[in-house]
Every structure is written in structure tokens, then in C-alpha cells.
């Protein structure tokens, strides 16, 4: 079996977790109490969904997930919500004081009191797996718990489970909408710490998702529930190949193999289509060609950046629903001929395709229309460096004045960590720049480079 353990850290992680597990349960026909009428075999059979759910002797399906927050209020909503019976009480872990948007509190002072308990629970989940393939970690960059505690957890997971894949789903601070002034600090500190521990990180930018909700779903003022349900659909598309028998199956390590050309360049850009409200869907025929085309519209991306200014290194199309390979090949051929998609010259235009015959499911009473087919595109493009550049710039503005730094130092951090993290991100931007340079021109001077 190829099990995956999901770890949801901090408010953003937990709330995205709620949306994801709600959707998984609907997709697999699992009731909120964990019973699954369609599953006739009692005990852990070799059903594909057992990658995400473990099965008890009584036929109850329990998510292989841990929810962690340093303060109780958000996880308490899970404890008293619709799905309270789905999770084992030990899977919901909370501390008493929050990280107060402070990376240092999440990573050092408050985080270290909880980390051993969390690792212990993760160990219990890992012991129930016959062949654990890795971890999916959900968190935000901006919050104290999401940034500080996650990076501490990643370091410890690398020690305990060295070779297992670790994929992150990270909420990137939106360029305009901000929940904390110190987001740039937290983001850069957490990215620096987790860079060497994460195998692949899918970033989600709140503002990009706000815009998609406003533009495509006509929601005037999107709430976090609207955003998270959309994020849930994307996570579901990425993990569908692990949970269903697909025609072309993709597992966790396969993503990395196809999307990550160098260990540090592991931030694929995700795009999802069609995002459409029920009123509109009724009048539109969404063919494979149309949804494939939509993936190359910057408007449908989950991070604000412009791939037309960058180059693609790899591209992975995950289709689900009523899709046949012939249509996909035709759609991709069309795109290759007329699109201005620039691949780096050291990577022949490779599209990796996955097809899953399970159509997308929607949450009843949600905003998304029920569609016959959908696609999620994961592409590794140099354009995502724009997102880092924006963040680094904000960091520089504050750090030049050493604003707010005393809060971090007061929690046991050293000021040197700031400059070290910032240098690491400058190096990351440089890495992206070098990857996009044509190898023919650069051959002479780059002899001494490590690549």
C-alpha cells in the first residue's frame, strides 16, 4: 500500500484540511461518522482510498491526518463540527497559547513544547501504514504557527523519516490582502528553514484565489470557506491519482521526478479549470480543449505571476472525469503549435499527463458547478520567482529599519538568522534566473557552476 499522512498546521492548514476531508468523504462515499456503505470488505483491504483512510475492525474509516495548532479555537471547531466523529480525538492536537504571528514563537518557545507530542501521534499513524510513501503538509507562510511550527516539524520529520517524500501546500501571503504585518518575515524565515527539507511545495496565493472566486464564481466578497473549498478541489485533483485507480497513475515520488529539475527549484505553479458557477455551466460546453487552454491563462493560476515572462521547465496535466487520451493529445498538440509557451532549451517540451476516470465531485450547496471533466495543471516555471521577489522586497523594506525584529529576538532567535534567511532567498531567486538562461550562450562562463 502507498499511504500518505496529511498534516494540517495552524489556522490556514486546519481550515484547508476541513475543506479537503469534507471533499474526500464525498468523493469516496464516506459518511461523517466514518461509515462507508459501498465498502463491502471489512478491515484494511487494498482499496485505493486506503492510501488516505485507515479502516478499523468495525468498518469505520479514519483519515490518516493530524491537525495541529498552538491555540485551540480553530481545532475546537473541528471537534464540534459535522465531521467530529470522523477523526480520532488524538489526531486533533492543540496547545494553549498561540504563536501570535511570530515565527520565533512557533519554532522555538511555544512550538518546542508541542513538537514531541505531535511526532508521537505521527509515529502512531505511520505504524499503521504498510508502506508509507510520504507526508502532505498544509500550512500558511504568514502565520506564526504555520511558519514556525511547520519548519520545526519538517526538520524533525527529516530526521525521523529521512527518505519519505514531504510535499507542502503553502498559503502564500497575498500581495494586497494581508492578515499580519510581519508576514514577509515569517515567510522568508520558514522558506529558508524548510527549503532543504521539502521535496515539493505547491503555493497558493490568497489574492489569486479571491480573484478567481470574484471573477469566475461571481462572489462579491469571498469568505475563507469559499477560498478553501476551491483549494480543496485542487488538492483533491492532485491527490486523486493516489486515491482512485487511474488510467495513468501518478504517485508522490512521480510528481517530484517530473516536476523538480533541481532540489531547490521545487515550487510548481498550480492552475485549475474549470472554475465555474452553476448558472454559467448550464450554458457552456466545457470540452477537453477548452479546459486545457484555460490552464494557460494566468487568471486561473493559484499564484500571481506571469508565465509568459518566464520559461517552463516541466508541465504536468492531471485530468479527471470524462476524458480520453485522444482528446488530450489533440488539445496539447494545439497548444504547442499556437501558444507562446517557452520551455527552457535544456528540457524538450514534455507534458506529463495523468487521467482519472472519477469525475470531480462538488460540495452540496457550494459555489462550484458539477462538471463532467476538470484538469489541474502543475507546471514548474521560472515565473514563480516573481512571487519570491515581491516577498523579498517587502522583507527588505521592514528589515532595513529593523522593524518588529525585537519580538523575534525576544523569543530566543538571533538577528543573524534574518540575514541568513534573506541571503538564502536571494540565492533562490538567482537559481531561478540561472535555470532560465539558455545553455548555449552560457556554456563558456558557467563551466565552474555546480549545475
UniProtKB/Swiss-Prot annotation:
Known EC number: 3.6.5.-
GO cellular component, as recorded: cytoplasm; microtubule
Chief site of localization: cytoplasm
Annotated catalytic residues: 254
Cofactor(s), names only, from the UniProt record: Mg(2+)
First-tier enzyme category under EC: hydrolase
Domain of life: Eukaryota
GO molecular function, one term: hydrolase activity
Residues carrying N6-acetyllysine: 40
Catalytic activity: GTP + H2O = GDP + phosphate + H(+)
Protein's cellular compartments: Cytoplasm, Cytoskeleton
Entry binding sites for GTP: 11, 71, 140, 144-145, 179, 206, 228
UniProt keyword annotations, A-Z: Acetylation, Cytoplasm, Cytoskeleton, GTP-binding, Hydrolase, Magnesium, Metal-binding, Microtubule, Nucleotide-binding
Single biological process term from Gene Ontology: microtubule-based process
Alphabetized PROSITE patterns for the sequence: TUBULIN
Site (Involved in polymerization): 451
Signal peptide: none
Positions with a binding annotation for Mg(2+): 71
Post-translational modification: Undergoes a tyrosination/detyrosination cycle, the cyclic removal and re-addition of a C-terminal tyrosine residue by the enzymes tubulin tyrosine carboxypeptidase (TTCP) and tubulin tyrosine ligase (TTL), respectively. Acetylation of alpha chains at Lys-40 stabilizes microtubules and affects affinity and processivity of microtubule motors. This modification has a role in multiple cellular functions, ranging from cell motility, cell cycle progression or cell differentiation to intracellular trafficking and signaling.
Similarity section: Belongs to the tubulin family.
Subunit structure: Dimer of alpha and beta chains. A typical microtubule is a hollow water-filled tube with an outer diameter of 25 nm and an inner diameter of 15 nM. Alpha-beta heterodimers associate head-to-tail to form protofilaments running lengthwise along the microtubule wall with the beta-tubulin subunit facing the microtubule plus end conferring a structural polarity. Microtubules usually have 13 protofilaments but different protofilament numbers can be found in some organisms and specialized cells.
Function: Tubulin is the major constituent of microtubules, a cylinder consisting of laterally associated linear protofilaments composed of alpha- and beta-tubulin heterodimers. Microtubules grow by the addition of GTP-tubulin dimers to the microtubule end, where a stabilizing cap forms. Below the cap, tubulin dimers are in GDP-bound state, owing to GTPase activity of alpha-tubulin.
Protein name listed in UniProt: Tubulin alpha-1 chain
Upper taxonomic lineage: Eukaryota, Metazoa, Spiralia, Lophotrochozoa, Mollusca
Amino acid at each position: 500500500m502507498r499511504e500518505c499522512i496529511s498534516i494540517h498546521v495552524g489556522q490556514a492548514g486546519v481550515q484547508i484540511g476541513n475543506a479537503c476531508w469534507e471533499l474526500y468523504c464525498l468523493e469516496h462515499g464516506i459518511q461523517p461518522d466514518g461509515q462507508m456503505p459501498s465498502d463491502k470488505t471489512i478491515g484494511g483491504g487494498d482499496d485505493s482510498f486506503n492510501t488516505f483512510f485507515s479502516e478499523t475492525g468495525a468498518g469505520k474509516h479514519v483519515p490518516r491526518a493530524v491537525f495541529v495548532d498552538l491555540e485551540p479555537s480553530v481545532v475546537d471547531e473541528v471537534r464540534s463540527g459535522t465531521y467530529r466523529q470522523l477523526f480520532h480525538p488524538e489526531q486533533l492536537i492543540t496547545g494553549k497559547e498561540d504563536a501570535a504571528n511570530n515565527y520565533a514563537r512557533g519554532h522555538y518557545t511555544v512550538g518546542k513544547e508541542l513538537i514531541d507530542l505531535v511526532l508521537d501521534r505521527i509515529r502512531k499513524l505511520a505504524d499503521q501504514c504498510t508502506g508509507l510513501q510520504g507526508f502532505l503538509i498544509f500550512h500558511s507562510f504568514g502565520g506564526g504557527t504555520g511558519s514556525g511550527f511547520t519548519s520545526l516539524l519538517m526538520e524533525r520529520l527529516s530526521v525521523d523519516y529521512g527518505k519519505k517524500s514531504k510535499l507542502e501546500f503553502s498559503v502564500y501571503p497575498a500581495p494586497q490582502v494581508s492578515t499580519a504585518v510581519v508576514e514577509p518575515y515569517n515567510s522568508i524565515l520558514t522558506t529558508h528553514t524548510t527549503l532543504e527539507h521539502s521535496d515539493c511545495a505547491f503555493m497558493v496565493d490568497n489574492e489569486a484565489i479571491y480573484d478567481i472566486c470574484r471573477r469566475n464564481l461571481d462572489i462579491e466578497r469571498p469568505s475563507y470557506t469559499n477560498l478553501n473549498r476551491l483549494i480543496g478541489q485542487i488538492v483533491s485533483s492532485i491527490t486523486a491519482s493516489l486515491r482512485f485507480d487511474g488510467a495513468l497513475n501518478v504517485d508522490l515520488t512521480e510528481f517530484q521526478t517530473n516536476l523538480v529539475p533541481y532540489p531547490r527549484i521545487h515550487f510548481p505553479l498550480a492552475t485549475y479549470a474549470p472554475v465555474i458557477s452553476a448558472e454559467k455551466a448550464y450554458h457552456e460546453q466545457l470540452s477537453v480543449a477548452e479546459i486545457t487552454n484555460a490552464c494557460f491563462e494566468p487568471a486561473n493560476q493559484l499564484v500571481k505571476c506571469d508565465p509568459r515572462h518566464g520559461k517552463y521547465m516541466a508541465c504536468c496535466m492531471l485530468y479527471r472525469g470524462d476524458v480520453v487520451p485522444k482528446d488530450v493529445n489533440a488539445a496539447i498538440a494545439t497548444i504547442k503549435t499556437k501558444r507562446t509557451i517557452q520551455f527552457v532549451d535544456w528540457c524538450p517540451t514534455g507534458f506529463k499527463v495523468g487521467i482519472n476516470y472519477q469525475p470531480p465531485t462538488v460540495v452540496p450547496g457550494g459555489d462550484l458547478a458539477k462538471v463532467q471533466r476538470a484538469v489541474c495543471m502543475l507546471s514548474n516555471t521560472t515565473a514563480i520567482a516573481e512571487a519570491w521577489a515581491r516577498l523579498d522586497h517587502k522583507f527588505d523594506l521592514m528589515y532595513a529599519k529593523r522593524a518588529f525584529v525585537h519580538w523575534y529576538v525576544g523569543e530566543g532567535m538571533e538577528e543573524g538568522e534574518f540575514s541568513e534567511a534573506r541571503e538564502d532567498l536571494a540565492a533562490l531567486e538567482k537559481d531561478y534566473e540561472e535555470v532560465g538562461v539558455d545553455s548555449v550562450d552560457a556554456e563558456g562562463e558557467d563551466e565552474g557552476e555546480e549545475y
